Amino acid sequence: MDMDQQRFAGIARLYGQQGLQRLNAAHVAVVGIGGVGSWVAEALARSAVGEISLFDLDDVCITNTNRQIHALTGAVGRPKVEVMAERIRAINPDCVVHAVADFVTRETMTACITEAMDCVVDCIDSVPAKAALIAWCKRRKIPIITTGGAGGQIDPTQIRVADLNKTFNDPLAARVRSTLRSDYGFSRTQGRNYSVPCVFSTEQLRYPQADGSVCQTKGFVGEGVKLDCAGGFGAVMMVTASFGMVA
């Protein structure tokens, strides 16, 4: 058995040789290479997926250290997609990796997401971009799985998968649903399947306060607390990585 066969022999023993061949032939896009998406990309690479497209315009920031697999000291300031692509190639030199340093938006969708992709994993944290991507894939019958918000949570055992129209306790998923209904004509009927699997958590969110404490009620978030990357929801990799593994 040569090195290439040895690398994924464990995958073949789990899914069978035909299953391994299907993984080798698959092309998966990961949109958003952050706290969830970086772990998705890692899992795909280690599962013998033969072609992976990575989309993100952000650079690695030192504040990513707590939750993103590519956030190493030497990577700070470099494009996330480039760092992740190097990591994937180190895992599997035979994997074809497309590192696209751009955000997937309504305007860039045509150039980024095509029917040649077997699956798209949405790990974006922008509501308009998430909704645009989901609508685009649904209309073109490209399989897509989306992820809700992974910040403000500490218990990975509360992660679930449900249809996007049936999630709860997830403000990000709720806002995406609202946008899909208002801008893309998705059904307003509560509980009707969108046929879009969504990874989300049932856990009550923990909101940061200005005095350094946390609370579980948004209404008590102190003034001056901006829920952004630098000072918003806290996050821990055991949750963000679990979101990625479930996706």
Residue locations for each model-derived region?
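Conserved N-terminal Rossmann-fold NAD(P)-binding element of oxidoreductases
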Residues: 30-32, 55
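Hydrophobic/small residue at the entry helix of a nucleotide-binding pocket
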Residues: 36
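Glycine-rich phosphate-binding loop and adjoining beta1-alpha1-beta2 segment
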Residues: 49-92
